[in-house]
Amino acid sequence: MGRGGKGGFCMIKLIASDMDGTILDGEGNVPPETFDLIKRLKTAGIGFVASSGRRFDTLQELFAPVSGEMDFVASNGAQVVVAGQLVDREVFSHAALRRLKNVTDLFDGLHLVVFDRKISYLLDDEERFERELDKNLPNPLRVRDLPRPDTSIIKVSIYVDDAVMDMAYILEREMGEDFVFAPSGRKWIDVMQRGVSKATGIKQVMEARHARAEEVVAFGDSMNDYEIMRMVGTSIAMGNGRSAIKEISTKVIGPNTEHAVQRELEALLSMMGK
């Protein structure tokens, strides 16, 4: 735990958590006790932020019982919602996406998905990949080419058949001037615009909520959490997380399959007498 010495919970104003592999269970669901924890945090004066590569509409659905009592950093920072209001939305350049598609087309094992506010555009005709997409991405639409230039693309991901780290390296070499490529899990690479990330989204929430970095706690497991984990006062890595995330974090807890985030939040509230 590379930064140590900041593991105590004091003067917390915001808690940000990643979703998949972090606060969600092994089946990709929000454990039921989470909703009560978020309500209790709000009563205690602590805001909760869902920080994810997922789109806002998906997160809003996941947290439906408490969606009006929390903030959202969605689509890896491209959608930021504070107190129910969209405060920022970053869209991808169509020309840059065209260049990215030309690169991914070189590799049979790379499958590109682009997202607008409602639709997941699957640029692939491989049936196995379509089944993978259907597992957890809403409104999938299989297409032969990028959507029209006037479509507001807010999120881009690449499904990788094998060797996700190698492919992230290749993509960084090919398109690093335009994008950041962050492995997410074993099969996905999140594509982020330069200057747009979960960390930039959290900074906007912090400004709106008047919270300093040392007053923010973040939970995460993957490389798309790296910047935010480095930025906040207390970073808590999952036991199932990537080694690099564990190394730079204040603390390492159990895996998401054991509801470790929920146990940590319960411990915080108990310590506060809430």
What are these regions (language model features)?
Residues 28-44, 89-96, 138-140, 195-207, ...:
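Short, acidic loop-to-helix structural element flanking the phosphoryl-transfer center
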Residues 26-129:
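Active-site phosphate-binding/coordination module
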Residues 1-10:
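Short, Lys/Arg-enriched N-terminal segments with co-localized hydrophobic residues
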